[in-house]
Amino acid sequence: GYEGVDKRIDVLATAIHAGLKATQLKDLDLAYAPPYSSAKDPVNMAGFMIDNIAKGTLKQWHLEDMDKISKDKSVVLLDVRTVGEFNRGHMDGFKNIPVDELRERINEIEKGKPVYLICQSGLRSYIASRILEGNGYETYNFSGGFRFYDAVVNDRALIEKAYACGMDLSLIHISAPTR
């Protein structure tokens, strides 16, 4: 949502001015007001995510990887959203195992193949990634989640905003989600 965005911008501007590294955002001690924010501030959460990526704890895959991954049968494509979310729209070739069922259904995921994960925003696929990594799987989490993917596929102008820093958009082919 938009509530509190000004606070996050102030915090990030101060961090930039102070010369903090992105991985240090996780260590900021920010004011906590339960009615107005989560226990961990979104700035801290961004810092944790950046730290996980920097340390290699979390490996990501991106929108521009979609075409080469979806055609490659040497990987497992796994959507960990609820059945209802999956049925409202999903990427072609993805199997649906909700994260809440993952531990009980882990034997349905072929060992020895990298697992490419997606959920709605990234949290559940991160949790699934940790569960699978703990059981010997190599995992990659989709950056941005299905919400990002669906918005980009359904609004080409949005990708131009998302990649406004000079990326050649003609190199990106995006398949529409299955409905």
Question: What does each model-found stretch correspond to?
Answer:
Residues 1-25:
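C-terminal catalytic lobe of FAD-dependent flavoproteins
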Residues 23-34, 38-75, 83-116, 120-171, ...:
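Rhodanese-like catalytic fold shared by cysteine-dependent sulfurtransferases
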